[in-house]
């Protein structure tokens, strides 16, 4: 089976910047939703390097996927004199939380740059938030595009390998979808479009739409209940699935779709434990597994024929935009200078 990575640069994803310029010299505080996210780890490494290149001292703080922790840490940073606050919001899409943080930062008259995780489910509402403070900005991607591209990739792959993937020869492809977080806007979009866009490709070619493996699951996905997009969640789910849905029972899950590569890794580990998707792909059945982020671990799995495909987001592009806008706001320059 052909394995591939589709690359999506931040610009191609529609890098969006919503902006509302300077503070005293000091430390720039960057509050991360979690240090445990593999993609965000690559953004953090790139952002630290980009800020250092601009002569800025950065303090990175892990919120451990806890909004109260993030709020408390940001308030502490403001009291201790941060010259700017950069926020990777824990509660994605929670406008009330974003407003609370924005007001606290605005009160200290220092720049506020939110990035990556949406501040609202409504673009107009988000725009109004940033219009309300001239020293603020949002840097992010069009959160629908990774899911759309993943879905198209899946549809094209399944169409090309339909008979090979259809293990029980029932003329349908059964799948499982692993969702990273119930409320996160990117997770919602990837869960929706990862299947819908695949179905569009398949049905246009006269093939049936994908079929969720468990007809009793109305949501048609399994979510990480901790909201951390983790390989632990997908591993546990996949282990449980394989005990009931397998080739011996004639109902094997034939396709695995994941919101990110870390969840894909967990699913692959469970499959490997059951004798599927072994390194090299020889002498075993390989269940197609798709993710998002094109992490180093995912690229290695693809090279080893254990994983099928991933969508790459541009961590460096995201980091450069955040660093440039933050440094410009601190220096009192036009926030877009250098972009």
Can you name each region flagged by the protein language model?
Residues 2-4, 24-339:
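A residue-level marker of the well-folded mature domains of exported/periplasmic proteins
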Residues 4-24:
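Sec-dependent N-terminal signal peptides of Gram-positive bacterial secreted proteins and lipoproteins
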């Amino acid at each position: 089976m052909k394995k591939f990575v589709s690359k999506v640069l931040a610009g191609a994803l529609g890098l969006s910047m919503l902006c509302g310029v300077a503070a005293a010299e000091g430390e720039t505080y960057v509050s991360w939703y979690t240090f445990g996210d593999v993609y965000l780890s690559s953004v953090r490494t790139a952002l630290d390097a980009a800020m250092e290149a601009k002569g800025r001292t950065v303090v990175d703080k892990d919120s451990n996927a806890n909004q109260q922790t993030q709020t408390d840490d940001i308030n502490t940073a403001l009291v201790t004199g941060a010259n700017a606050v950069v926020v990777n919001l824990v509660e994605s899409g929670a406008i009330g939380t974003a407003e609370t943080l924005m007001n606290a930062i605005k009160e200290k008259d220092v720049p506020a740059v939110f990035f990556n995780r949406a501040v609202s489910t409504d673009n107009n509402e988000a725009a109004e938030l940033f219009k309300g403070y001239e020293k603020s900005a949002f840097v992010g991607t069009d959160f629908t595009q990774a899911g759309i591209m993943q879905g198209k990739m899946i549809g094209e792959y399944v169409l090309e390998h339909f008979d090979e993937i259809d293990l029980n020869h029932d003329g349908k492809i059964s799948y499982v979808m692993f969702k990273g977080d119930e409320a996160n806007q990117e997770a919602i979009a990837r869960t929706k479009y990862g299947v819908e866009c695949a179905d569009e490709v398949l049905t246009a070619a006269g093939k049936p739409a994908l079929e969720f493996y468990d007809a009793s699951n109305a949501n048609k996905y399994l979510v990480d209940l901790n909201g951390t997009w983790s390989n632990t969640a997908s591993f546990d789910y996949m282990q449980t699935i394989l005990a009931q849905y397998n080739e011996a029972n004639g109902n094997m899950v034939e396709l695995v779709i994941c919101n990110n590569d870390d969840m894909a890794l967990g699913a692959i580990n469970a499959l490997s434990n059951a004798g599927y998707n072994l390194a090299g792909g020889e002498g075993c059945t390989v269940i197609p597994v798709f993710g998002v982020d094109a992490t180093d671990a995912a690229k290695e799995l693809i090279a080893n024929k254990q994983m099928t495909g991933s969508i790459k987001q541009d961590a460096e592009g995201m980091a450069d935009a955040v660093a440039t806008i933050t440094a410009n706001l601190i220096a009192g320059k036009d926030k877009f200078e250098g972009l």
